[in-house]
Amino acid sequence: MNETYTPPTILLVEEDDEVRPLLSQNLRNQGYHVVVALNEADAIERTKGGSFCPDLILLNQVGRSIQEYAVMGQRICKSAGIGNQTPIIVMAEQYGADMEGKDVQVDDTEYVTYLEDGQQLMNLLHRLCPVYSELSEI
């Protein structure tokens, strides 16, 4: 294979200073290129003018509704000129035991994950945005 492999890029929007470095490192350890944004304005600034096109947008819900975060993901896509095909995942902040461990597909490209553990998130990411080692196994 003569082509240079470029890992998928995840735009991580994470406001929590304690969670941000751990989550971004875990994503890198899984083979992803990670661009970290602190909030929506930072994400828009980083993607403005098509400076880069993430393969997936990952938002950690903090303090606002899941719907507000989904709309935030849509605004980031629109401002970056990213098509509607880019998956958006919102990691839910608070939820009941009945939702724990579930991944809910809201529409064609939007998902809400109610995490039971970190492996659940990685499984969803690998399904929506596989890394090279997974592609070579297909």
Model-derived regions: residue spans:
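Short beta-strand/turn micro-motifs composed of small residues
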Residues: E14, L59, V90-A92
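Two-component/phosphorelay signaling modules centered on CheY-like receiver
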Residues: D17-V36
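Non-catalytic signal-transmission and effector/linker regions of two-component phosphorelay proteins
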Residues: M1-E18, C77-Q85, E110-I138
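Acidic, metal-coordinating helix/loop segments flanking the phosphotransfer/catalytic sites
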Residues: V36-L56
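Conserved phosphotransfer microenvironments
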Residues: E40, P54, L58-N84, M99
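Alpha4 helix (beta4-alpha4-beta5 surface) of REC/receiver domains from two-component response regulators
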Residues: Q67-V71, I82-N84, V90-Q119, N123
